[in-house]
Regions:
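Short, internal acidic amphipathic alpha-helical interface segments
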Residues: 58-99, 103
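Ordered, soluble secondary-structure elements with a strong preference for glycine-centered loop motifs
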Residues: 3, 7, 66, 111-118
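Well-ordered alpha/beta subsegment
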Residues: 94-122, 133-143
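Helix-rich interaction surfaces within compact, conserved domain-sized segments
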Residues: 125-129
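Charge-rich, low-complexity N-terminal segments
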Residues: 1-47
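Short, ordered beta-strand-loop transition motifs
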Residues: 25-29, 48-50, 90-98
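Long, continuous compositionally biased terminal/linker segments
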Residues: 38-70
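Short, highly charged C-terminal tails/helix-capping segments
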Residues: 136-176
């Protein structure tokens, strides 16, 4: 890739995911969403505030009680693999207020080649899947079943896309 274009970078990321049998959805805003079998999802986007950076943000669907924070902190500190850094997240406004999210990023100011992008993306997505599996085993409340409200959405006619509609859909797929 010679020039940095977020849409091109994300298009290559989506192609790499699909070529490796990883389910990857393009959102109307251009970002990508990778669902995980154990629950949760990885949101892929390009941040261009300063230098362009490809971000992967992985989060489970649910949360657990504050009493489990020390176990989750231990898990996040012990399980810190290549390409993903889990952190404990506390949202005091929610009844199940403790969750874990994972972050991976690739500085893209040097226009990574497809091979470099694949070398970053594939391990990051594999580790995100492993993290979701681990959370499902150790803290099942973090990876709840998808909301039953998603089923009618699958067959619903497409409505005009707005930021408000995206904000309403993201919690249904596990992004807080």
């Amino acid at each position: 890739m010679s020039e940095i274009e977020p849409s091109l970078l994300l298009s290559h990321a989506r192609t790499i995911a699909r070529d490796n049998d990883i389910s990857c959805w393009a959102l109307p805003t251009g970002e990508l969403l990778v669902p995980h079998a154990a629950g949760g999802s990885t949101f892929i986007f390009v941040d261009q505030l300063e230098e362009p950076v490809l971000h992967l943000h992985t989060s489970p669907r649910g949360g657990v009680d504050l009493s489990e924070i020390s176990e989750l902190a231990y898990l996040a500190n012990e399980w810190n693999h290549d390409c993903i850094s889990p952190v404990v997240v506390v949202d005091y406004d929610q009844p199940d207020c403790v969750s874990v999210s994972g972050h991976s990023y690739l500085p893209a100011d040097t226009s990574p080649s497809r091979e470099q992008l694949a070398a970053f993306l594939l391990p990051a997505l594999r580790n995100a899947e492993v993290l979701m599996d681990l959370l499902a085993q150790s803290h099942p409340g973090l990876v709840r079943e998808a909301s039953p409200e998603l089923a009618p959405l699958a067959d619903a006619p497409l409505e005009p896309f707005t930021l408000d509609s995206l904000a309403g859909l993201l919690p249904l797929i596990g992004i807080q």
